Structures are given as structure tokens and as C-alpha cells.
């Protein structure tokens, strides 16, 4: 009887929390490569009519990932969501996390994530609706080992750049770069570089700073260029058009990898600022030169 009462009170607390607090999960995309960053947004709306105190405990917001086919997903650690805050009634709070480092989702397939919100003041918890996503396999296009110096005279660490393409939404090809150890046993980062066409002749060169320079075709006459750091972050992205000549990678006389040919598109920050009419200087009447009558 006592167990039944405890279960009943817990169930009542769950329904109370669910009715007065909304929680929604969202992803920027639904398809990811193994080891790619999976940025999840958790939207919490307070409809209880009173202030909520959230985030004070380490386990106030927890996550669970499962494979739809029953494959066991190993949880490496709890996803950290830090920072206490007060959520007033009718207010919305958004917390953003990356699921990738904390769950082993290396097998291609369909997965879903569920978030659980623990409300300490109510001794209650509520679970979100599952958010589904897919982990897809990429096709390897190119790979190369490179060395990373650690600032000492020791032998450099050997890592590997790998370019992969994946059919995003089965409609659009996307180009990815993976940074791993030489054996590809440890993947440090997978980054999406952007869309590409099926007939793209992708060029890749590692420069003297161990950065990867990539040039690929993204449209009928458009090309994208990216520089990737040894840690997998993108240092620079430029866009070129096939006007008069096709862009290609080359090494100049200084030993730097550069883009030769094509027409580079200026970035918005490089364009001159056009002021609105109300900020333009006022028009002034032109000063006419004085004419002296020499016949007088």
C-alpha cells in the first residue's frame, strides 16, 4: 500500500510538471556523420504562474540517447548543463548542448534523444518528446597524414585529414573533413564544410603550417575554399566564381598554398557601408566663381 501511494504521488507530480512546463528539443539538421557535432537546443517554457529556480543542481537536466533498432548506445558521461537561473512565468529559456562527446553513436542508423527536467522545488520531473535524427556513413574522397608540433623538440604527433562526402537528405551532397589519429582509432573532430556537386573535382593540400586547404565545386559556376586547422576547426572560408578562368590550388613562390584563377566574391564585411538618406550630408549650393568685368 505504501509503495502504491509513493507511485501515485510521483505520477501526480509528473503530470503536474508536464501540464505547467513545456519542453521542446530541436536540431539544426537531422542527418549527421559519426563523430560529427550534434548541437541540441532545449527550449523550456514556464506556464506555472510562479517563478522556477533551475540549474542549481548538476543533474537538473539530463539526456538519454537510444537507437531505434535497439542497439545499445554507450553513455561516456553526463552532458554538463551549468548555470543556475530563475525562469519567470510565461518566459522561455533555451539551453544548448553538444551530444556527440557524451554518447557513442558510431554506428549508422536512426537514433532519438529524450531530455528529462528535474524541478527540485516541486520534487518532480518531466520528460520531453523524443527527437529523432540519423547517423549516416560518408564516402571517403581523400586522406593524408600530417604532423602536429607540441612546441618541444620531440617528434611531432601524427594525425590524419580525411575528406568525406555524404548524401544529406538524399538530395544534396555535403563535404566533410575529419581529423583523427593516423590509425583513425581516435576521431578528434568532424566538421561539415558545405554543399558540393556530384561532379566536383575536390582539391586538397596541406600547407607548411599543417593546415588543410580545400577547394571544391558547390554549384554550376561556384566554388568554395576553406582552410582547416589541425584541431578540425575552420579558420577561413572564401567563395569563388568561374569567371574567365576556373579557380585551382597552387603553391606560390613563398611556399604558401593559394587559390589561382576564378573571381573571389567579396564578403559583406569587405563591402563599403552605404548610409541611409537621412544620414547623408546635406546638399550645399555650389559657389559660383566671381567674374570681374575688365572692360570697365
Positions of PLM-derived features:
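Short beta-strand elements that form the blades of beta-propeller/WD-repeat-like
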Residues: 150-179, 203-219, 225, 247-272
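Contiguous segments within soluble domain cores/interaction surfaces
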Residues: 20-25, 31-33, 37-100, 110-116, ...
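N-terminal signal peptide c-region/cleavage motif recognized by signal peptidases
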Residues: 14-16
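Surface-exposed loop/turn elements that mediate protein-protein interactions on large endomembrane-trafficking
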Residues: 174-195, 222-241, 267-293
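Terminal connector regions
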Residues: 102-137
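Positively charged n-region of N-terminal signal peptides that target proteins for export
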Residues: 1-4
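Low-complexity, Pro/Ser/Thr- and charge-rich linker/hinge segments at domain boundaries
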Residues: 130-158, 238
